[in-house]
Amino acid sequence: MYIYLPIAEISMHIGIIIGLGGAVGFLSGLFGVGGGFLMTPLLIFFGIPPAVAVATEANQIVASSVSGVLAHMRRANVDFKMGSILLVGGVFGSSIGVMLFAFLREAGQIDLVIKLSYVFFLGMIGFLMLLESLRAIMRTRRPGNHKTKLHQHNWLHGLPLKMRFRRSKLYISALLPLAIGAFVGILAAIMGVGGGFIMVPAMIYLLGMPTSVVVGTSLFQIIFVTANVTFLQSVQTQTVDFVLAGLLLLGAVIGAQFGTRAGVLLRGEQLRGLLALMVLAVSIKMGFDLVIRPEHLFSVELLK
């Protein structure tokens, strides 16, 4: 059964939309990411305009993240204090990001910026995460292996305004998570992602949080940051397709529950390795689409 998407102005099969939501929701619960880094490119591949895909995906991420957080809360794997600090920075950053999104859309450059952002950030983060996870797996297989810290203390840990985060067993400056949250918030607005593909590595390698707590805490802040993005996109750019978002939401809520259960079966380094491979695959696909010769060199659209 096909359904017409009013904002995207195309028709898609309901089963495909719900299936995409379920698959990405599963990955959201498994890796602690909003899933936007996969869903937004997938929507673009299926013909959804990039600007609509970005704004709509932010709405769907809220639902899948809520579902994932509830599951992690039952396991006490959420650091609410750390999540709140990240959230403050995220709301500030996402507000700036939406204004930048509107400016680029008016200039006619938003589609190119979205695709280039995916290629650059996903490629860089995916490569670094894969490299580290492979090293961690090799260390665990060596006889007499010992645990190695994923992060090292440096000048960042000497910043002022220090706070104690008991659930994460950290005593660090609040400026660090604030800055990380703001940066991820900007990306959430421009790329239509929850920012988990950057937030999760940053929480592990920069903040030094335990992997078990990172997933739930990441999803917690994603809920509110992407909700802010959805509201601002609806008001300023009118690019949120609520019909598409509702169908994606239906599949995502169910998929996130199964993903959370599956995540318990894997070790931290295995989770990071799988996430890195997913991120790299999307980056390569987006980069390939930018350089290949398009089927139609020119297109004609009616001015509205």
What are the language-model segments listed below?
Residues I190, G194, L207-P210, V214, ...:
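Alpha-helix capping/termination and helix-coil
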Residues V54-S65, L87-V91, S218-I223, A252-V253, ...:
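Transmembrane helix-bundle signature of multi-pass membrane transporters/permeases
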Residues M1-L20, R74-F183, Y205, V235-K304:
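Juxtamembrane transmembrane-helix boundary motif
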Residues M191, G195-P201, T211-T217, V243, ...:
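Extended hydrophobic-aromatic, low-complexity segments
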Residues G47-E57, K81-I85, G208-S218, F242-G246:
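The feature identifies polytopic integral membrane transport proteins across all domains of life
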Residues G21, G25-V33, F37, S64-V69, ...:
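Transmembrane alpha-helical segments of multi-pass membrane transport proteins and ion-pumping complexes
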Residues M39-V52, A188, I198-V213, L232:
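Interfacial segments of multi-pass membrane proteins
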Residues G36-G83:
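Juxtamembrane transmembrane-helix termini in multi-pass membrane transport proteins
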